[in-house]
């Protein structure tokens, strides 16, 4: 079910159900969360019970719950995945986010399907194909620019989802195999070893060092705050925040930030609306600078930029807050541009490495000057010279505000009380149009003080503090001001609210899986390499059904034993170091994008440059010991070494 074209959906991540609830309270229109398995985040799974409890909470606000089932599946996992999908459907979740096309060939309920960013959706033809085979919502590649997004939007009937904030994978999503090649941990199965965050030395084709021991594959974090309006104009309707590993404070803060940004656009334009209901009030000032980030970039949305990498450090440095004046044995003196507090996280950069510490005690010693005693004094801190820059990556006082109730979300209710002396009639209508009527029989006398009685009735009916509602409009149409005991009025109101709650949940409609377009679509390629990530026979059947003739096995099947692209990325190190032929002045033909090397310890990777699409291919080879390991997801691979030993036949004489 494609969303209404004027609805804007803020989609937040959740590591667990508690974070999901807070994301919704802070303004999310939808939340994506991992289920018990197959969720592309190895350590971010949740039980069916937790998800089942979360669903009605979300639906009270018209918010949707998407469950990630976006790993590629081994044949041995197809049956368990099919059972899990049925169980998830029965909990009431709104949609599945999937990568493996084999899922579309399984016998599953008619649950709405969303195409994961792992599907590597960069071109119109692929986006249209996915929309035509049954995907209601598609997550586009982060590397696309505004015109590419607009072209896909115009060509498909699927809701366009796009990442607007959070960590950036340097590779096209779904096109990174370096983790599996080096460690046996597959990124396409949610177990990335993050080789992109390691330090590398870059060498040219003559072996000369271009850059030494820098984090050359580590990207800054995505931040599309300034581009929200342009993304809306391009057709984006679901605005996705990355971060299913992020903590509660991060999700609260970033969700609140984008809620306020989108609400301002909605109010300004008038022809747009949020995709869920409720009024959100935040009790803190959101700041994208105060929770984890590696610096900010809008990546390729507008144009290629040179400054997209976090080469110095993949860690969170924070904001500048002053400089170090002196370092003693167990304290340091600093001059600060902002007040410091006990518990602050502070750091300095020494030879491109972050040296951090927690402030145990902070004492003001003069105007903008402080003496700071760390919990543990880092030895490297004594290398710092006077006036060395000081950063803060944990603002203790600001973080404390996020540990408390930091937001409130309530749904508007219009209240009408009518009737007569023998019966009260209470009508509640929620902002999403659900209406209930509740009656209270009795003998209610006219009050001696009609003004006071009327005010008491209104005040009693408006007491909605422990509910997710607030009174937007109040009308009393009784023929006279009647006296109603507070105990009766409170019970009457509570019963009506319970009725409204039940009616709204019953009225909620979740989407269904789209039917396949007729005539049946044809996949835009007839030959699929390992880059298509086909890992099971059901995925093969799917692609054969739609016209693909030759299908290579996924990289995790261990059939690619030679050197292949283990990472394909829009990030180009030639461009970053002004070595791109397109940057050359004069005779461009004299410049060649010759291969380069990335070196980390004993690991040597070759860089090849495809200048027509402006891509860099990282070439590597799977390690021999990984080739001998069981295929990820197979029954053998899922058995512990101890359990596997039990299954082996015993040798004679042992």
Question: Which stretches of residues belong to each language-model region?
Answer:
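Surface-exposed amphipathic alpha-helical tracts and adjacent flexible/coil segments at the periphery
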Residues: 1-26, 30-33, 37-40, 54-55, ...
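Aromatic- and glycine-enriched glycan-recognition loops and surfaces
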Residues: 43-52
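Short, glycine/polar-rich helix-capping loops at beta-to-alpha or helix-loop-helix junctions
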Residues: 122-126
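Short active-site loop/helix that positions an aromatic residue
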Residues: 102-109
């Amino acid at each position: 079910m494609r969303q209404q074209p004027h609805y804007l959906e803020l989609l937040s991540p959740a590591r667990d159900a508690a974070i999901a609830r807070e994301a919704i309270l802070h303004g999310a229109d939808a939340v994506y969360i991992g289920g018990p398995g197959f969720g592309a985040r190895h350590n971010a799974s949740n039980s069916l019970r937790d998800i089942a409890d979360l669903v009605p909470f979300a639906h009270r606000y018209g918010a949707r719950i998407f469950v990630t089932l976006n790993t590629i599946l081994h044949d041995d996992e197809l049956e368990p995945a099919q059972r899990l999908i049925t169980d998830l459907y029965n909990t009431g979740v709104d949609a599945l986010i999937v990568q493996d096309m084999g899922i579309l060939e399984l016998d599953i309920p008619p649950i709405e399907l969303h195409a994961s960013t792992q599907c590597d959706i960069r071109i119109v033809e692929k986006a249209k194909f996915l929309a035509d085979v049954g995907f209601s919502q598609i997550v586009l590649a982060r590397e696309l620019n505004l015109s590419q997004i607009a072209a896909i939007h115009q060509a498909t009937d699927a809701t366009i989802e796009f990442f607007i904030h959070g960590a950036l994978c340097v590779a096209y999503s779904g096109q990174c195999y370096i983790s599996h090649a080096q460690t046996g941990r597959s990124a396409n199965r949610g177990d990335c070893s993050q080789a992109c965050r390691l330090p590398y030395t870059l060498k040219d084709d003559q072996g000369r060092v271009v850059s030494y021991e820098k984090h050359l594959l580590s990207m800054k974090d995505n931040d599309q705050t300034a581009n929200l309006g342009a993304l809306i104009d391009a057709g984006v309707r679901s605005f996705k925040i990355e971060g299913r590993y992020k903590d509660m404070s991060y999700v609260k803060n970033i969700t609140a930030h984008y809620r306020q940004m989108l609400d301002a656009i909605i109010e300004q334009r008038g022809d747009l609306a949020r995709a869920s209901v409720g009024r959100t009030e935040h009790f803190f000032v959101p700041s994208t600078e105060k929770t984890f980030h590696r610096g900010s970039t809008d990546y390729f949305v507008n144009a290629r930029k040179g400054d997209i990498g976090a080469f110095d450090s993949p860690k969170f440095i924070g904001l500048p807050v002053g400089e170090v004046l002196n370092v003693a044995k167990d304290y340091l003196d600093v001059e600060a541009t902002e007040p410091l507090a006990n518990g602050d996280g502070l750091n300095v950069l020494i030879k491109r490495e972050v040296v951090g510490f927690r402030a145990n005690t902070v004492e003001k010693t003069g105007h903008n000057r402080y003496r700071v005693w760390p919990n543990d004094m880092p030895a490297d801190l004594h290398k710092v010279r006077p006036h060395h820059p000081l950063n803060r990556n944990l603002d203790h006082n600001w973080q404390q505000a996020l540990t408390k109730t930091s937001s409130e979300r309530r749904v508007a209710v219009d209240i009408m009380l009518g009737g007569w002396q023998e019966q009260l009639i209470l009508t509640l209508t929620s902002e999403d149009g659900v209406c209930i009527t509740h009656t209270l029989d009795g003998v209610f006398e006219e009050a001696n003080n009609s003004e006071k009685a009327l005010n008491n009735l209104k005040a009693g009916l408006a007491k909605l503090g422990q509910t997710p509602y607030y009174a937007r409009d109040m009308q009393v149409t009784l023929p006279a001001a009647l006296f109603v005991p507070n105990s009766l009025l409170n019970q009457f109101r509570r019963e009506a609210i319970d009725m409204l709650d039940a009616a709204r949940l019953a009225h909620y409609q979740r989407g269904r899986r789209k039917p396949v377009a007729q005539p049946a679509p044809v996949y835009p390629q007839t030959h699929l390499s390992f880059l298509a990530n086909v890992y099971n026979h059901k995925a093969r059947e799917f692609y054969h059904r739609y016209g693909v003739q030759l299908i290579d096995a996924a990289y995790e099947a261990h059939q690619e034993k030679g050197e292949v692209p283990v990472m394909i990325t829009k990030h180009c190190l030639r461009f970053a170091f002004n070595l791109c032929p397109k940057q050359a002045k004069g005779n461009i033909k004299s410049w060649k994008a010759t291969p380069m090397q990335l070196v980390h310890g004993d690991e040597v990777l070759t860089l090849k440059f495809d200048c027509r699409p402006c891509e860099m291919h990282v070439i590597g080879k799977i390690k021999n010991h990984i080739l001998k390991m069981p295929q990820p997801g197979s029954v053998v691979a899922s058995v512990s070494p101890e359990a596997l030993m039990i299954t082996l036949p015993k040798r004679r004489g042992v």
